[in-house]
Amino acid sequence: MDIAIQHPWFKRALGPFYPSRLFDQFFGEGLFEYDLLPFLSSTISPYYRQSLFRTVLDSGVSEVRSDRDKFVIFLDVKHFSPEDLTVKVQEDFVEIHGKHNERQDDHGYISREFHRRYRLPSNVDQSALSCSLSADGMLTFSGPKVPSGVDAGHSERAIPVSREEKPSSAPTS
């Protein structure tokens, strides 16, 4: 039996068979016209894809950077306060969990929860890890790298989330 596998790039081109925002992270934030009638955007022009990249960039997608000197994770958590977030390190992984109870917004009541897990490079100094939340809701998790051959230290511990009053300097891609 052959199963057709479709690349995510073409997923939105199928219009009404794959609703763009009905079941993703934006659930409960209200719908736009093209969410209910996604095939209309393709009638304007076959090259017009309004929500393809906007949805990806605004859906809480994280950015991981690992260069020679440091390891950094940027994660959009604008709907969560520092009290709603838990960041902990277990072995070679960092786990970021966010949950807020049901609260009222413009469209009714909503509760949110997410869980992300990232593998830390083996040369990240786990004793010097830090995590901060900017005023615009960007969580930044970072840690310096140590030279090869130096013990980076591995232990299970919680990382406190500090609040910054200035907006994030993270790229918006």
From Swiss-Prot:
Reported modifications of this chain: Acetylation at Lys-70 may increase chaperone activity. Undergoes age-dependent proteolytical cleavage at the C-terminus.
Modified residues (Deamidated asparagine): N101, N123
Stretches for region Disordered: 144-173
The keyword Flavoprotein is assigned to this record: no
Subcellular location(s) per record: Cytoplasm; Nucleus
Stored PROSITE patterns: SHSP
One Pfam family from the record: HSP20
Positions annotated to bind Zn(2+) 2: H107
Keywords annotated in UniProt: Acetylation, Chaperone, Cytoplasm, Eye lens protein, Glycoprotein, Metal-binding, Methylation, Nucleus, Phosphoprotein, Zinc
Glycan attachment residues as annotated in the record: S162
Binding site for Zn(2+) 3: H154
Modified residues (N6-acetyllysine): K70, K99
Residues that coordinate or bind Zn(2+) 1: H79, H100, E102
Name listed for the protein in its UniProt record: Alpha-crystallin A chain
Protein source organism: Sus scrofa (Pig)
